[in-house]
Design a protein with these regions (language model features):
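Terminal intrinsically disordered/low-complexity segments used for targeting and assembly
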Residues: 2-75, 153, 157, 241-288, ...
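Transmembrane beta-barrel architecture of outer-membrane proteins
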Residues: 25, 66-68, 131-133, 180, ...
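Small/polar, glycine/serine/threonine/aspartate-rich low-complexity segments that form flexible
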Residues: 45-48, 52-61, 110-138, 261-279, ...
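Membrane-embedded beta-strand positions in outer-membrane beta-barrel channels/transporters
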Residues: 70, 133-135, 182, 227, ...
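Sec/SRP-type N-terminal targeting helices
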Residues: 81-82, 98, 143-171, 197, ...
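Alpha-helical heptad-repeat coiled-coil segments that mediate oligomerization/polymerization in large
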Residues: 216-219, 383, 390, 425-429
Length: 476
């Protein structure tokens, strides 16, 4: 008997050249756009410190209690948890798309028993027939001759990587928000204590004025001025208490646990800096390190791959299906000699007329890439603006903090002298009250400037990419 012209081995040999060229991509060669920013940072130079590229957040935050709070937030914050789930979703979508590049294989077994009436039977008599089949089947598999599937897989991979970098950016933002909320809470607590001390001092002064008034040594005007300062301190006390509670509430929300309020410690008033100075490094390092810039570039690469898929749609698509196994009219004969069976179905699809659909899809892919380029460049410009602002803030606030500390020390000495001169009858009560006001204002301003300087350092840390160490955000 003559052997069939097409056997499985012959088919594989015929398809070998096609399999070798399959996967050639038609996507444009990716080139990173030039950064639309200067080669160096504008504004003042940064203060000496650890380079951001070598500084993770555990090192940047020198206060152990603040580090503990950040860890709590990273493990419990709902917004971050949702972002991490988005990573898992993007990863699953990439795996689904990647699976289309590999032929599938499935096992099958089926049986069929039917009765044919005589008018449909070849011999003119009715009868019952049976058939059984066991084997392996190849689901529809596309030979990726022009890289359509590869381009779609590349786009899915870049989308997944963009999602992971977006989550890393959200993680850095959460670290910064917790740190700044804690610093605001610390500043509010310090201002509240200063106001309490000032109120107590002014109440003592009011009592002294009342005694001097009874003795005829002070006027009603002196008493009313002293009373006004007491009421002012009481109003300031309530304002600072409100700010402290609101800072605490913000911190509780960020931590994300029911018992968060009980886990926030009171900040010791003599505690030094909670975070440390950092050096920004070079602009080129920022492009490689900052997660939102990396995410924008991954989005750009995904749109570049989409162009390859859109171009491949103009060319023929070849898909394969088939099966190989044994068939028999009796179940007991499935594995007898000569029961082997196979089926091979190649399909060629060639676009002829689509009313301009493929051209429109290609135009859309190109426009989306141009949009991604603009978004990438805009992200870089925004990042450089944030770094420049943070550098300016840390530089000026550092000098301002020094000046305000010196001013507060001066007004404190002035207050001591004014009090002694007033009690000695050398100066008027009005000058003593002015010294009290000035001292309170300058002490409060120093506390606020000190707080804002540390908050600005956190802003700089976030703007520089948070000292990312390259570790995955989510468990892979």
């Amino acid at each position: 008997m003559r052997k069939p012209a097409f056997t499985p081995s012959a088919v594989l040999l015929a398809l070998a050249p096609l399999l070798l060229i399959a996967g050639c991509s038609m996507a444009p060669t990716y080139e990173r756009p030039d950064a639309p920013v200067a080669a160096n940072w504008s504004g003042p130079a940064a203060q000496p410190g650890r380079a951001a590229s070598n500084l993770d957040w555990q090192t940047f935050i020198v206060d152990s209690e603040l580090r503990d709070l950040v860890n709590i937030a990273l493990n419990n914050n709902r917004s971050l948890r949702q972002t991490l789930l988005d990573i898992e979703q993007a990863r699953a979508q990439y795996r689904i798309q990647r699976s289309e590049r590999v032929p599938g294989l499935s096992a099958s077994a089926n049986g069929n028993r039917q009765r044919l009436p005589g008018d449909l039977s070849s011999n003119g008599s009715s009868g019952v027939s049976s058939s059984y089949q066991v084997g392996l089947s190849l689901p529809e598999y596309e030979l990726d001759l022009f890289g359509r599937v590869k381009s779609l897989t590349d786009a899915a991979l870049e989308q997944y990587l963009a999602t992971e970098d977006a989550a890393r950016s959200a993680q850095i933002a959460l670290i910064a928000e917790v740190s700044q909320a804690y610093l605001s809470y610390d500043g509010a607590q310090r201002r509240l204590l200063l106001t309490e001390q000032t109120l107590a001092s002014r109440e003592d002064s009011l009592a002294l004025i009342a005694q001097r008034r009874s003795a005829g040594a002070a006027t009603a005007l002196d008493y009313q001025e002293a009373l006004g300062l007491v009421e002012q301190s009481r109003a300031e006390l309530e304002s600072n208490a409100r700010q402290k509670q609101q800072s605490l509430n913000a911190l509780v929300l960020l931590l994300g646990t029911p018992d968060a309020a009980s886990r926030i410690p009171l900040v010791p008033l003599d505690k030094p800096m909670l975070v440390q100075d950092i050096a920004p490094g070079t602009p080129s390092e920022l492009i490689e390190r900052r997660p939102d810039i990396r995410a924008a570039e991954h989005q750009l690469k995904a749109r570049n791959a989409d162009i390859g898929a859109a171009r491949a749609a103009f060319f023929p698509r070849i898909s394969l299906t088939g099966s190989f196994g044994t068939s028999s009219a009796e179940m007991s004969g499935l594995f007898d000699g000569g029961s082997r069976s196979w089926n091979f179905v190649p399909t060629l699809s060639l676009p002829i007329f689509d009313a301009g659909r493929n051209s429109a899809n290609l135009d859309l892919a190109k426009v989306r890439k141009d949009s991604a380029v603009a978004a990438y460049e805009g992200t870089i410009q925004t990042a450089f603006r944030e770094v420049a602002d943070a550098l300016a803030a840390t530089d000026t606030l550092r000098r301002e903090e020094i000046a305000r500390r010196a001013l507060a020390n001066t007004t404190e000495e002035t207050l001591k002298l004014a009090k002694a001169r007033y009690e000695g009858g050398v100066d008027s009560h009005l000058r003593y009250l002015d010294a009290q006001r000035s001292n309170f204002i300058n002490e409060a301003a120093y506390i606020e400037t000190s707080t804002q300087r540390q908050i600005a350092l956190v802003d700089l840390f976030r703007a520089l990419g948070g000292g990312w160490d390259g570790k995955p955000v989510a468990q892979r």
